[in-house]
């Protein structure tokens, strides 16, 4: 997250860190949507990944953090068909149901789409500097606004006329998602409205 601040430790009980199983390296984020499923981006598909729930600082292992092995990943269609603006969505089923605790709880799924101009938050352990990659130990949060899709379409000429992607950000720039935050949630009014796919 560029231009954000450290998230409050109580602010993200649904935020999941995805690690590569072998190198135990953090590479993506996800959102716990119930005791058995984590919602993330299709680009975060890895052969063997471990989902870590209830983690705040990557440096200090809290007793509350629980590592869960993934049982199966379900992508929207043949995983090869996702693009930066379509079907970049995946569900990871946990091998065993996660016990809800203060540090790990599910995010409410959105009942209705967020209106343009609504304020939402993005969060994750992605890089916090643009010139070089600087991964923080604790997740960063940033407030951004929802926009009409046409606003993003004007900014990124490659976007198709119709898309299932949401458009969000800050028009004056300076606040954005960045490398390593993919798969993390877009939260509006405490509900998950989207999944971070890419920032520009």
Swiss-Prot record:
Sites annotated Forms a covalent bond with the inhibitor PMSF: 182
Transmembrane spans: none
Residues at the active site: 88 (charge relay system), 182 (charge relay system)
Pfam families reported for this sequence: Trypsin
Regulation of its function: Inhibited by Pefabloc (90% inhibition), DTT (90%), Zn(2+) (80%), trypsin inhibitor II (50%), and benzamidine (45%), but not inhibited by EDTA, Ca(2+), Mg(2+) and L-Cys.
Compartments, as annotated in UniProt: Secreted
Entry GO CC: extracellular region; secretory granule
GO terms, biological process: proteolysis
Posttranslational modification: N-glycosylated. The protein exist in multiple isoforms.
Entry's Gene Ontology molecular function annotations: serine-type endopeptidase activity; toxin activity
Stated role: Snake venom serine protease active on several blood coagulation enzymes. It completely cleaves fibrinogen Aalpha chain (FGA) after 120 minutes, partially cleaves Bbeta chain (FGB) (overnight) and has no activity on gamma chain. It does not release fibrinopeptides A and/or B exclusively, since the enzyme does not provoke fibrin polymerisation. It also degrades fibrin as efficiently as plasmin, and exhibits potent ability to cleave plasminogen and prothrombin, as well as heavy chain of factor X (F10). In vitro, it cleaves insulin B-chain (at positions His38-Leu39, Ala40-Leu41 and Tyr16-Leu17).
Entries under PANTHER family matching the protein: KALLIKREIN-1, KALLIKREIN-RELATED
Subunit record text: Monomer.
Name of the protein: Snake venom serine protease VaSP1
């Amino acid at each position: 997250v560029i231009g954000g601040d450290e998230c409050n430790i109580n602010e993200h009980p649904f935020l999941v860190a995805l690690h590569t199983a072998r190198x135990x390296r953090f590479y993506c984020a996800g959102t716990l949507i119930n005791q058995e499923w984590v919602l993330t981006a299709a680009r975060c598909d890895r052969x063997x990944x471990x989902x870590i729930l209830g983690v705040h600082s990557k440096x200090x292992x809290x007793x509350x953090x629980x590592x869960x092995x993934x049982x199966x990943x379900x992508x929207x269609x043949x995983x090869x068909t996702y693009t930066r603006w379509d079907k970049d969505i995946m569900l990871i089923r946990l091998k065993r149901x996660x016990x809800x605790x203060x540090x790990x709880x599910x995010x409410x799924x959105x009942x209705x789409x967020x209106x343009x101009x609504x304020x939402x938050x993005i969060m994750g352990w992605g890089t916090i500097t643009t010139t070089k990659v600087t991964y923080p130990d604790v997740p960063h949060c940033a407030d951004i606004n929802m926009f009409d899709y046409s606003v993003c379409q004007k900014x990124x000429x490659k976007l198709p006329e119709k898309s299932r992607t949401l458009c969000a950000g800050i028009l004056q720039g300076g606040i954005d998602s960045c490398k390593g935050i993919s798969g993390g949630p877009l939260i509006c009014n405490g509900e998950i409205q989207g999944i971070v796919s890419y920032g520009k």
